[in-house]
Amino acid sequence: MTICDTVDQYTIMSGDRLKIKDLLCNRLTECGWRNEVRLLCRNILLEKSANNSVSVDQLISEVTPKARTLVPDAVKKELLMKIRTILAETDEDN
């Protein structure tokens, strides 16, 4: 089991995963990431629709790498700090 799997499993069991997910969703909305990804999807659909229809799987495979690069470093750092805080609190409790 990797460290990511262990952290993921712990956050699910402790109930903190929902808090982390909510924080991520809020930050992505605040920084405009959701709108950027929406526009990215729209542009891909417009570009591809001229040729033929685009499946959801094709859209996801094309958008995902680009969307990941659009996540601001500040959001990534804040999430990492939150996860570290949760894990540190766990160590203190044990």
From Swiss-Prot:
It is found in: Nucleus, Nucleoplasm; Cytoplasm. Transmembrane segments: none annotated. Its main location: nucleus. The keyword NADP does not apply. The keyword Transcription applies. Keywords: Activator, Chromatin regulator, Cytoplasm, mRNA transport, Nucleus, Protein transport, Transcription, Transcription regulation, Translocation, Transport. GO terms for molecular function: chromatin insulator sequence binding; transcription coactivator activity. One of its GO terms (cellular component) is nucleoplasm. Signal peptide: none annotated. Pfam families: EnY2 (PF10163). One of its GO terms (biological process) is protein transport. PANTHER family: ENHANCER OF YELLOW 2 TRANSCRIPTION FACTOR. Involved in mRNA export coupled transcription activation by association with both the AMEX and the SAGA complexes. The SAGA complex is a multiprotein complex that activates transcription by remodeling chromatin and mediating histone acetylation and deubiquitination. Within the SAGA complex, participates in a subcomplex that specifically deubiquitinates histone H2B. The SAGA complex is recruited to specific gene promoters by activators, where it is required for transcription. Required for nuclear receptor-mediated transactivation. Belongs to the ENY2 family. Component of the nuclear pore complex (NPC)-associated AMEX complex (anchoring and mRNA export complex), composed of at least e(y)2 and xmas-2. Component of the SAGA transcription coactivator-HAT complexes, at least composed of Ada2b, e(y)2, Pcaf/Gcn5, Taf10 and Nipped-A/Trrap. Within the SAGA complex, e(y)2, Sgf11, and not/nonstop form an additional subcomplex of SAGA called the DUB module (deubiquitination module). Component of the THO complex, composed of at least e(y)2, HPR1, THO2, THOC5, THOC6 and THOC7. Interacts with e(y)1. Interacts with su(Hw) (via zinc fingers). This is Enhancer of yellow 2 transcription factor. It comes from Drosophila grimshawi (Hawaiian fruit fly). The gene is e(y)2.
